Amino acid sequence: MLSLSLGGQFMNNNIRVGSLFGIPFYVNPSWFLILGLVTLSYGQDLARFPQLSGGTPWILGLITALLLFASVVAHELGHSLVALAQGIEVKSITLFLFGGLASLEKESNTPWQAFAVAIAGPAVSLVLFLGLTIVGTQIPLPVPGQAIIGLLGMINLALALFNLIPGLPLDGGNVLKSIVWQITGNQNKGILIASRVGQGFGWLAIAIGSLGILNILPIGSFWTILIGWFLLQNAGSSARNAQVKEQMEAFTAEDAVIPNSPIIPAGLNIREFANDYVIGKTPWRRFLVIGADNQLLGVLATEDIKHVPTSDWPQVTVDSLMQYPQQMVTVNANQSLFEVAQLLDQQKLSELLVVQPSGEVVGLLEKASIIKCLQTSAA
């Protein structure tokens, strides 16, 4: 599976176990539960072979389970390596209760690049299925070995086919998203359609699982219901994210600038600054100092004026006390508000300086002002 923000509660408390091609590799505590269950199931099946005795079936069951999850990791690496080739950072690969997850920093730039990333995982699983099938049919192996190879081959086939279901958050949903994106030219429409299809499959899985538990259908179990719930939750999350993105893309950074941002002109003396901007005025403790051309010159903290005797305030100007803000990140006033919000989140910033293309300061922007902008537009 692929994700920009997938996982929810299942992705908490991950344990880092190393790196793969420079990609951080994690396992979620829920993975150990499924590892134990799979080992138990495979061990019981292998214990039926008379050639295997004692603890051998259980050791082979554990090895088979680990090879199964190695197949899942290979599937996720397929996504990840194609994404890396497109210059997209892969933040992590995680094994968890429902399989594996490759977490990408951002979307691909084009529909066909998105298609390539999405299809790479199932393609790897299909290649593994073909390779294991050839090994199992062409190379003489003990019967238990043939059973293990055959099982791994079929699991990889099932992994590919299940992930090709055309609904988010599955790979098939990302394939559908890229196709709709290519046809309509609208990425959000692709996400919304693939999310709705994913929700439909989620409800279908829940229905099948419920009917199976009631013995109305010969298939379906509690596990089917759990998978359906997972699909519903994450498809719904994808749809909501797409709607928020669509709303935010209608605005620019300038639209979300804080009204009356703390901007003061160079040449202002400390007495004027204190009277007009500080004493009984605003809660700001840091001000942007701009020149006659409205370009940023520096930043003045209110704490700095305490070092100047009050008798000297009329003679000392703010630009003589200011410091240049080396760490302040700027964005273009015309930049999409969605891109700006992503920058705030990715770099863990509290605020951004918004400037015109010519460099003129517009004001400050922060998460609260983005939320207020969206709420005002929705009212």
Curated annotation (Swiss-Prot):
<keyword id="KW-0378">Hydrolase</keyword>
<keyword id="KW-1003">Cell membrane</keyword>
<dbReference type="GO" id="GO:0008237">
    <property type="term" value="F:metallopeptidase activity"/>
</dbReference>
<dbReference type="InterPro" id="IPR046342">
    <property type="entry name" value="CBS_dom_sf"/>
</dbReference>
<dbReference type="Pfam" id="PF00571">
    <property type="entry name" value="CBS"/>
</dbReference>
<keyword id="KW-0862">Zinc</keyword>
<keyword id="KW-0812">Transmembrane</keyword>
<feature type="transmembrane region" description="Helical">
    <location>
        <begin position="148"/>
        <end position="168"/>
    </location>
</feature>
<feature type="domain" description="CBS 2">
    <location>
        <begin position="322"/>
        <end position="379"/>
    </location>
</feature>
<protein>
    <recommendedName>
        <fullName>Putative zinc metalloprotease sll0528</fullName>
        <ecNumber>3.4.24.-</ecNumber>
    </recommendedName>
</protein>
<dbReference type="GO" id="GO:0006508">
    <property type="term" value="P:proteolysis"/>
</dbReference>
<keyword id="KW-0479">Metal-binding</keyword>
<feature type="transmembrane region" description="Helical">
    <location>
        <begin position="54"/>
        <end position="74"/>
    </location>
</feature>
<comment type="similarity">
    <text>Belongs to the peptidase M50B family.</text>
</comment>
<feature type="transmembrane region" description="Helical">
    <location>
        <begin position="212"/>
        <end position="232"/>
    </location>
</feature>
<keyword id="KW-0677">Repeat</keyword>
<keyword id="KW-1133">Transmembrane helix</keyword>
<feature type="active site">
    <location>
        <position position="76"/>
    </location>
</feature>
<feature type="transmembrane region" description="Helical">
    <location>
        <begin position="20"/>
        <end position="40"/>
    </location>
</feature>
<keyword id="KW-0472">Membrane</keyword>
<dbReference type="GO" id="GO:0005886">
    <property type="term" value="C:plasma membrane"/>
</dbReference>
<feature type="binding site">
    <location>
        <position position="75"/>
    </location>
    <ligand>
        <name>Zn(2+)</name>
    </ligand>
</feature>
<feature type="binding site">
    <location>
        <position position="79"/>
    </location>
    <ligand>
        <name>Zn(2+)</name>
    </ligand>
</feature>
<dbReference type="InterPro" id="IPR008915">
    <property type="entry name" value="Peptidase_M50"/>
</dbReference>
<keyword id="KW-0645">Protease</keyword>
<dbReference type="InterPro" id="IPR016483">
    <property type="entry name" value="UCP006404_Pept_M50_CBS"/>
</dbReference>
<feature type="transmembrane region" description="Helical">
    <location>
        <begin position="115"/>
        <end position="135"/>
    </location>
</feature>
<keyword id="KW-0129">CBS domain</keyword>
<feature type="domain" description="CBS 1">
    <location>
        <begin position="257"/>
        <end position="315"/>
    </location>
</feature>
<dbReference type="GO" id="GO:0046872">
    <property type="term" value="F:metal ion binding"/>
</dbReference>
<dbReference type="Pfam" id="PF02163">
    <property type="entry name" value="Peptidase_M50"/>
</dbReference>
<dbReference type="InterPro" id="IPR000644">
    <property type="entry name" value="CBS_dom"/>
</dbReference>
<keyword id="KW-0482">Metalloprotease</keyword>
